[in-house]
Amino acid sequence: MWVVLFYCCAGVIVYSYLGYPVLLYIFSFRRKEKFDFSPGNEPAVSIIIAAYNEEKVIASKLQNTLALDYPSSQLQIIVAAYGSTDATATIASSFGHVLVLHEHERKGKAAAINEAIQHAVHSIVVLTDANTILSAQTLKQLIAPFADEQTGAVAGEKKVISAEGAAVSGEGLYWQYESWLKQQETKFYTVVGAAGELFALRKELFVPVPEQTITDDFFISINVNFKHKKVQYAANAVSTEIASASLADEWKRKVRIAAGGIQSLSLLGKALNPFRYPLLTFQFFSHRVLRWVFCAPALVILFISNCLLVLNGSTKVFLWLLLLQVVFYLFAFIGWMLAKKSRSFFLFNVPFYIVFMHAAMLAGIVRYANGQQSVLWEKAER
């Protein structure tokens, strides 16, 4: 029994993080697609900036947006500052040609996006966060794939750096892996979910987000797939985000995302209908369902079953595998101790981030099951 559990759990983890990407690579390694608009023919775009209590960064965000290499006559900029109790709306209003939407009632990010998108006047809408900085060419790179009529949405590239500007080794490495995976997904069929820091979609494909939705970005992008359009990935559409200032803030963010992932299974269950969406079902199950539901518990069961196999006198192979796991978790513990002191070392930080991420997934499952996760997003200190 324990041998079966061990191999099943190992299989789930290996397939989710290695097997699925390898399959995508094999099936699509020859596909190369490049779309672009000719200079002077760029489509008009509405940019929506979600900005709840972002007085510290909204000015720099708007300056960054206005400095993008894109025809200003083709841009509409909207700041959704709903529920903000600081000077976010006032600061944003000081910029010319910026539409500021502000009400005192706070309903959550999903409600803010639903309202803001009604004010978008252009056919392509870009959603971005106030704490995300874009490179000069990002908007052109993000919009280029829309030259293909089958493209319904485009996900940008996310980079996480420290306050000093250095890449965050654990999370940064994870996002490099995710970026590579998105490249393979784009070649195969579609990116499964887009990060809310930066993505674009055709306005006509937008489906209003239920107000109790936790991960609004995922809901919006999967609904694009439901209309048989692709979500592409633009590797050169770079957005940069400063990592959370504290482990506590990062923990809350990851638990919230994990809870949102579990919620998405009930909201977007038809993505698991292989008769209606065969390719999407394969990708959704392999990339999202396995990670959200199975991988974190599988890591726990893998360790427990390994311990029991060694105690029951199984072959030395299981003893070596257990020793590897112990060393891995020891490194993760050291990484945690270093992170508490705002220090990092690659050898320890990567195991720590992996454990931290999966522990947050477990907590998110429990939190959502208990109905404890609020739809209101809390801004992390950065």
Descriptions of predicted regions:
Residues 146-164, 168-177, 212-216, 220-287, ...:
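Catalytic donor/gating beta->alpha subdomain of glycosyltransferases that bind UDP-sugars
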Residues 64, 81-89, 105, 132:
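A conserved acidic beta->alpha catalytic loop
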Residues 63-74:
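Short, acidic, metal-binding catalytic loop of nucleotide-sugar glycosyltransferases
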Residues 26, 31, 38-39, 291-373:
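Membrane-embedded multi-pass helical conduit in multi-pass membrane proteins
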Residues 125:
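Short aromatic/hydrophobic "clamp" motif used to bind/position activated sugar donors
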Residues 72-78, 89-119, 157, 165-169, ...:
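Conserved donor nucleotide-binding strand/loop of the catalytic core
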